[in-house]
Amino acid sequence: MAFTDYETEQLRKALLKETRRCAVTLGMKKTSVDQLTKAVGIAKGSFYKFYESKEMLFFAVLEGIHAELYGVADHALSETDGLPPSERAAKAVLAVCRRLSDTGDMVFIENDAKLLLQRLPEGVKNVHYHDDETHIRQ
């Protein structure tokens, strides 16, 4: 079955949301593609139209978390313009830590990020390696 552009976008968002939930509650190793596809209502074969592997989906989740954390830090820095740099940095770090605690994402990062990065193709890691510089310059 072919999906419309709208359906594709909605299913991609649903896969990301469900994967993030599973990353925190079950972990990457205990989460299966079958489980994810059933949760969003697509056939297992359709999964590969969205992501080439389970690892690439979990990597997309990790990248989303990464981008959110930069946003949290940036927001904290923008709210503390008048403070000394050390206080601004401390507030940004605390804001990021609070977000990690509130979302439970630290569980995924602590338990699965290293293994996930080991399983990714070198080309993928090389393309995304310099993303921090991109976030910082924005």
Protein language model features and the residues they cover:
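Generic hydrophobic, amphipathic alpha-helix propensity
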Residues: L11-T19, L36, V61-I65, L69-A73, ...
